[in-house]
């Protein structure tokens, strides 16, 4: 299936594409008005919209790439493209937020005259666009869950997911988009407030203060994405499974005939796919098939979808 057909056939992709077009069009309006009126608040809000557009485009592309089948070069598929893109996007957002804060402090020390003739109209228009985005993605944020997909392992790959505990995974792609739009909405509210204060009170300092507020919204909304994507790329044990994995290891050690567990590795392949491998040392007289099945059931219940177990008989 080509990318265009994928967008047309998938409800979530259609929503992303539609809002991407709306957001991109109004971003240019905000940039133009911001530079003409010399409003840092409006320019910073437009910068955030620029990265929102990048996030939307990445999410749209990732939703297509993630569907491509695994091949000889990408044995696990390309699901990690979304994770890598999210990390890069998060780093740039933090940098933009820091630059806006620095510029804001300069303007607090040396306030500049700002033209408010068209600023209020543009600010309210930006708020309307972001409210449309919230309506678009609120349902997905509230209800969407990712489906866990298993990958074929090496020595023994367990694929019976019906035995696993009923776990739901948030669709991190849609969640991230919703949080971006929510932060943008709060930023638009700040721009409208600062414009009103400048127009009717003459408080020029309201513009840089609003910009600092927007920057805080940008950074605070992106830090969880930055941390989570970095942990996935560094193959950290999933935070949500730490306790369950420890209990699973204890349960496996209680199986009759098991001597020890070695070379144990668990990591997030993508936001939803969890992979585990380990060597299981058992006694020579133990039943390999029975022990493998019991160990597989235990780790499936702990949330590991793709499990590879190597059985090693050890003389005692």
Curated annotation (Swiss-Prot):
Gene3D superfamilies: Cation efflux protein transmembrane domain. It is a multi-pass membrane protein. The keyword Transport applies. The gene is MTP8. Involved in sequestration of excess metal in the cytoplasm into vacuoles to maintain metal homeostasis. It is found in: Vacuole membrane. Belongs to the cation diffusion facilitator (CDF) transporter (TC 2.A.4) family. SLC30A subfamily. Residues 1-15, 67-80, 138-176, 224-316 are cytoplasmic. Residues 147-166 are annotated as: Disordered. One of its GO terms (cellular component) is vacuolar membrane. Keywords: Ion transport, Membrane, Transmembrane, Transmembrane helix, Transport, Vacuole. Residues 37-45, 102-116, 198-202 are vacuolar. This is Metal tolerance protein 8. It comes from the Eukaryota. It holds the Pfam family Cation_efflux. The keyword Transport applies. InterPro entries: Cation_efflux, Cation_efflux_CTD_sf, Cation_efflux_TMD_sf, Msc2-like.
